[in-house]
């Protein structure tokens, strides 16, 4: 986010020397990016969408699906970082949430499951009936008919 909106908080992995160059690249290709994506009632996002965060700012899922429009006026809501990650919020935004937040916070019920990353797991993905964190440096395939997630070897 700090490359798309230069006002966004500076965070780890920010390359200040190349910020302007990468920012221009993102802006020229902004139509190719999405905050969330849905396939067959599965919701994909970087870190997860929690009802606590959407209710706090009265954000609708429709708004999140329109990334360019969302950036036009609500981008600062993406800066919410939870206590779990050293921030000041109960739950993080869809770019900052931590999978551990899924234990105590509600997920939108209109989806079969959320597929997320952002929280590096040791060796195995974290998969429940409602959310799957697949950030283990491996590739997976989701069968939307059987709800099975399998590692691709």
PLM features: residue spans?
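Low-complexity, flexible helical/coil segments
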Residues: 76-86, 148-153
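Generic detector of intrinsically disordered, low-complexity, polar/charged segments
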Residues: 45, 69-70, 83-84, 89, ...
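Polar low-complexity intrinsically disordered regions enriched in Ser/Thr and small residues
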Residues: 51, 75-76, 89-90, 95, ...
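Active-site neighborhood of divalent metal-dependent phosphoester bond hydrolases
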Residues: 1-80
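Residue-level detector of solvent-exposed, low-hydrophobicity positions
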Residues: 56, 74-77, 82, 95, ...
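Conserved beta-sheet core of the metallophosphoesterase superfamily
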Residues: 95-152
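Alpha-helix-centered segments that form part of catalytic cores
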Residues: 15-33, 82-112
């Amino acid at each position: 986010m700090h490359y798309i909106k230069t006002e966004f908080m500076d965070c780890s992995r920010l390359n200040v020397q190349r910020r302007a160059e990468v920012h221009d690249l993102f802006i020229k290709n902004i139509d190719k990016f999405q905050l969330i994506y849905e396939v067959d009632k599965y919701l994909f996002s970087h870190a997860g969408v929690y009802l606590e965060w959407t209710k706090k700012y009265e954000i609708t899922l429709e708004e999140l699906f329109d990334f360019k429009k969302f950036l036009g006026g609500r981008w600062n809501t993406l800066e919410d970082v939870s206590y779990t990650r050293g921030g000041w919020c109960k739950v993080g935004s869809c770019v900052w949430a931590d999978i551990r937040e899924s234990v105590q916070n509600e997920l939108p019920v209109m989806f079969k499951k959320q597929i997320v990353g952002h929280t590096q797991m040791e060796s195995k993905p974290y998969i429940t009936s409602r959310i799957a964190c697949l950030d283990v440096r491996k590739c997976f395939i989701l069968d939307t008919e059987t709800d099975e997630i399998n590692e691709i070897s």
